[in-house]
Amino acid sequence: MQGRGWIAAAVFLADRITKLFAERFLRSAVTLIPGVLGLRPARNTGMSFSLLSGHPVLLGILSLGILTGAFLALRKKKLDSVSQTGLMMMLGGAAGNLADRLLSGYVLDMIEFLFIRFAVFNVADACLVTGCGLLIWNLFRGKENG
């Protein structure tokens, strides 16, 4: 995995810690930065940003697909550091949310932007989206390899 496995591990660990904190201490919405950022516990039976709620089998297959695809892509010998980082972020995020689904039957979301109407999300979701963004950016730069 070309030496960046720590990124996936860090994402997974950060996701688990924030979810355990939210599960234990976050009972209702809390504003961190007025009008900008807050925390609000929400049980999500869907995937990132509540998409596909009520389809647990499809979500499990999709999570396994992301994990498998990221793992296979990381086995590629000439993958640049941006692509490696993006894939590791996706791997850690997918593993974090899959662990929730397997352990609880739902994913705990808690991060909320207050200045726009948007879904509540978690660290794993943010890393999945950021990792995808890095891969797309790299593709447009023409740097997905070497």
Residue ranges of predicted features:
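Alpha-helical transmembrane bundles and membrane-interface segments of multipass inner-membrane proteins
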Residues: M1-G146
